Structure formats: C-alpha cells, structure tokens
Amino acid sequence: MSRARETVRRTIRDANRASDVIARLRALFAKKEANIESIDLNEAAQEVIAVSLSDLQRSHVIVRSELADDLPSVTGDRVQLQQVILNLVRNAAEAMREVDDQPRELTIRTEADGGDRVRLTVQDAGIGLGENAPERLFQAFYTTKEGGMGVGLPISRSIIESHQGRLCARPNGGPGATFSFSIPRSGDSVMNALTLGGLRNVAASDGMTQHIGST
C-alpha cells in the first residue's frame, strides 16, 4: 500500500510540474511583439546574477564574473535574452548539484566575438555532457535531469536564433561544460532585420506549440 501511495504522490508531483512548465511556456508564447532596444549584455547578465544569487549561494555555487570592458551593445528583447541567461545559469547550477569533491564554480563571461558579434558564456564544473552529443541537448523534451521537462534549452536556442545568433554547448577540458551564445552587435542592419520580423513568437520557430496546445 505504501508503494502505491508513493506512486500516486509521484504522479501528482510530476503532473503539477508539467502544468507549471506549460503555464510558463504559454505565458512566453503569448507575447506577440518583442520590445526591441539596445542592450548592455554585461548589465543584463549582472541583473540575472543578482536575482539568482541567493539560490546559487544555497546550492554552494561560487559565481565568477569575467565581463569585458567596453563591450559593444547588442540589439534585441532584453527579457528574452535574460531568460536565456537565467536558463543557462540554472542549468549550470543543477549540473553541479552532486559535485562534492571540488568547488562548484560557475563562470559567466562576456567578450567581443570578432568584429561584429558579442559572446556570452556560462561555464560550470559539473558532471559534464557525458556521451550525449551536445546537439541532442537542444532537442525538444530531451533531458538528462531527473524530473526535467527538456524544454529550456530548445526555447533558449529559438530565442537566440531569432536574434540572428547561435547557441551551442561543448565539454570542458576538465570537469563540466560550457554553453555560449553569440549575437550581432548593435547596428542599423540588425535593428532593421529584427524590426522586420526576426523576433517573432519563438514558438512558431520550433513547432513546440503543438505539444502544449492542450493538457
């Protein structure tokens, strides 16, 4: 009987988690128009760190910021880009949850990427990518986390691609993994491209709405 009760509790818990994820996805997808503006990516990253710091400290995560001086601004939707940064930070912290034999270090870094792009990187000292090809991490509903829904990274990639950028993952030389995205620096051509429809509803770019249309 106790096993049956535990099965029921687990089923209810998983259903509640799925319902919460679906609600958040619908809220994101309901945003019809992006607020396009010039963004200081350093400032955006610092704001994400600030709102995440208490959770990171409770998880014994050491945060290191390596933010480039005189970083060129980027053009896009601040909320969407901060959603991506927050997701990468949370994933990094989660990857280090079981690490006990070394410091749980999370490094967030910004830099100019060539002459016309800006890169943001989140590096952790967690369990790494294992034998899973990095590209699989960006497939909808693929997850390596217990209880995970596998939607955060696909949505993040859709957001970055809608900003004319690229999001990728790679294993570190030592422990952990590195996730980074690169997007164009601000300029008239970028502003025009985004205004003409580059920043549409991210759901439309990956077909994910068909999975959340009903519960």
Per-region residue spans from a language model:
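Histidine phosphotransfer helical core of two-component systems
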Residues: M1-N16
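A conserved beta-strand-to-alpha-helix junction within the catalytic ATP-binding
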Residues: R5, E37-I49, R109-A112
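Conserved catalytic submotifs in the C-terminal HATPase_c
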Residues: Q46, Q57, I62-P72, D113
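Short beta-strand-loop-beta element adjacent to the nucleotide/active-site pocket used for signaling
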Residues: D101-L120
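Short conserved segment of the HATPase_c
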Residues: L129-F141, G197, G213
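Short alpha-helical Gxxx[C/S/T] motif in the catalytic ATP-binding
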Residues: G152, S156
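Detector for a conserved hydrophobic position within an alpha-helical segment of the HATPase_c
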Residues: I160-E161
